[in-house]
UniProtKB/Swiss-Prot annotation:
Underlying gene: rpsC
Organism annotation: Rubus stunt phytoplasma
Key words, A-Z: Ribonucleoprotein, Ribosomal protein, RNA-binding, rRNA-binding
GO terms of biological process kind: translation
Family: Belongs to the universal ribosomal protein uS3 family.
Name the UniProt record assigns to this protein: Small ribosomal subunit protein uS3
GO CC annotations, alphabetized: cytosolic small ribosomal subunit
GO molecular function: mRNA binding; rRNA binding; structural constituent of ribosome
Amino acid sequence: MGQKSNPNGLRLGIIRTWESKWYDVDKKVPFLVGEDFKIRTLIKNHYPKSTISQIEIKRLKKSNDEFIEIDLYTSKIGIIQGPENKNKNSLINKIEKLINKKVQINIFEVKAINKIAVLVAQNIAMQLQQRAFYKAVLKSAIQKALKSGIKGIKIIITGRLGGAEKARRDSISMGVVPLNTLRADIDYAFEEAHTTYGVLGVKVIINHGEVLPNKTIADTRQIFSSQYENKKNNNKRHFVDKKNFKKNTS
């Protein structure tokens, strides 16, 4: 029943890896998992939405001191760093006070923002909170995602749509979204939009294609460069001088 399970968790250990990369004694694991959860919630509350797509936490040990390395994947490096790295340094101070450990933050830029389910869901939720019409928001999000070179997308929205008295569910899908195919690179995200007439739930499911043998998710997603932009640049018309054109045709 792949449609009733989280597509991200269903593919862990098959084509996806864990976002918390560390190993420790069994007694410490519950405490460290809770610590990771606190770090993630603090980072999400520190920055506005539609900025961070992924948070990776690595735990290292130097001598007897534990050292935490955090990788942030974002579409807006300027907001994350701030002027003279003020936002980044303030975040490091908050995390170090929370867990009493040394922290290092690495920031990586993501360019193809319309291919990442988390950023798409956050963008939709933000527009719904600004009282935009939900059907127009969903259609524009799907068009932008398809232009970026994905194989398929499905968006599900639930709640009091358009301020209706009765809550209902609406969905739009384009392309192929095989949830039961474990080798398919499915990116899933859920966000909540807090509006004046209630909370709306937004689910985004994006299919990046199949992960073939000897390949990884990075090969299918190509989040650092858009396939659509490369095709668009190749299809540009090249104007030739009339004199040279006449000489070539004769």
